[in-house]
Amino acid sequence: MIEQQQLNITYFTLLVNAHLTEQGNQEQLYEAKDWTSFVHTWGTELGLHHELIAELANKRYFVDANYFFQRTKQQIEDGTSPIDTILSISADVSRHSGYPILQKGVAKSCAAYLSSCAENSDTAILCCGFSALPVVMILLTQGLRVDWHFPPRDPIESSLLPYLPKICGAGQLTIKSLENRIGPLAGHKSMASAFVLPTGYSVGFYLLPNYWDSPIDGESAEELADTSMILHFAEILWSRKQAQQKFREELVDRNILQSVLLLPPGGLNFSGVQLAALLLQKVRQSNLVQFADFSNEKLSRKDSDWQIPFDSLSKTGVKVSVQSLAASGYLLDVKRHVMACSQELQTMTAGESLALKDLVSITRAQSIPENDGSGSCMAIREVLASDINDLGIIREPQKNIQVGQNGVSRAINAWLKHGDILIAIKGSVGKIGFVQDILADITDSQDADNKWVAGQSFVKLRIKPSQTNKLTPEYLFRYLKSPQVQKYFASRSLGVSIPMIKMADIEALPVRLPAKEAIEGETALHNKQLTIEKEIQRLQQELKNLELDLNTLS
């Protein structure tokens, strides 16, 4: 409630400023000192209900109302625009109360796209949720008509919201309170464009009546606005949840998906959650869908004045047919599709190439039962991502495991050998480790030095005996560490908090097979790197030995 009062103070002050500006009497705002008397004076002047005036002046919600009143006044005197003034307070509200507010840069991009769809100032644009506040203000400033649907109990006092066009100096606004936080995508054929995003505290939103349970069908598709934008968490592009999978199928199969954009991190105030924009068009002549990756951190909230050129999408990203999207399992992952059409992938598949699964055996690491104290055990070491150095060589693992009798056979099968390669498929996705100079001695059950197994975040690669004439472990290792292949892994990485990559994408990785001489050359370079690294380690140890030890002074 405290944060809501802060926003209402700023909102009301901006409203009075707009009123006084029309009258040419801004000095009266600058001269005001006390918040309570200010509210009573100008609330009555504007014709606000006496209960609303009393609520705004009620100090039980916030004892330092004068601070935010004076802060807003100062921003007005400094020439700060109404939208920037409100957003500065909204950021505080978002941080403390959990209400998500769009960054101004993202809002500018969304508004630019939506306004380009409006034929004239009478065209209605639908926006949903309090998060859309900056989008609404930008559209109103451009003199457009906005229908704003938002959940009940949002931060700004609902009785004040109809005055937003007065604050923005233009536009028309229709307010509708959403029941049960349901945000319709459309439903009014007069709306040329629609903007939908998660509302309030809700993680998801509803498309038409309820797309999670009843995705778009033929009848509801007819109710879609001519052009619509959905802003949602990027996870919706690849989530395996049945409802979201079905939602993607409907968008693709009905050919109403025009573009998919991956936005920079930080699109919402005080949140690292990544957003994606889905642009829908009810009537489309083309069967191609545009994919564009704008996830560069340089475009994040730290540089919040960026603006995605929605009107020039044809010059960015790649186009993928709806047939190809269906064949991919209706995955809308932007990085995957951009990479599939990239120069890097063409480089990887130039000349002779085979899928990784055709060249190596791929084994996913499994947990090994530890000793429960009931019998003899075996000591082993488990390789973690932190055990891989900058060159990709696995140094002596630090994690020791005592394997129980029931886990010995599994441990022996998981043994790492010289030339094995590890790929991280969870967490540090794409990190490559090479097993160098190790020979497990399974006859000694207590010595763990040469008994290494891969941690559960890895898959183990071992060249098939039938393929040793085509490549060496050293060449494959250097190939997997190349920038092009690392970009491939990044494009297949799913998830935000804990990234992961599917086994199918590892297996399908194209491996370029050059001439034998080139492979031998890469193997020689690998060995040269190892020689240099060993020399560096020797010199580092020599430097350490030259350090002064006070105990040696006589």
Place the predicted regions along the sequence by residue.
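Conserved S-adenosyl-L-methionine
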Residues: 97-203, 208-211, 233-235
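A short glycine-rich beta-alpha junction/loop motif
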Residues: 272, 278, 335, 449-459, ...
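Long recognition/docking surfaces used for binding and targeting
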Residues: 12-97
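Sequence-specific dsDNA recognition surfaces
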Residues: 357-372, 386-418
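Conserved Class I SAM-dependent methyltransferase catalytic core
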Residues: 202-273, 277-278
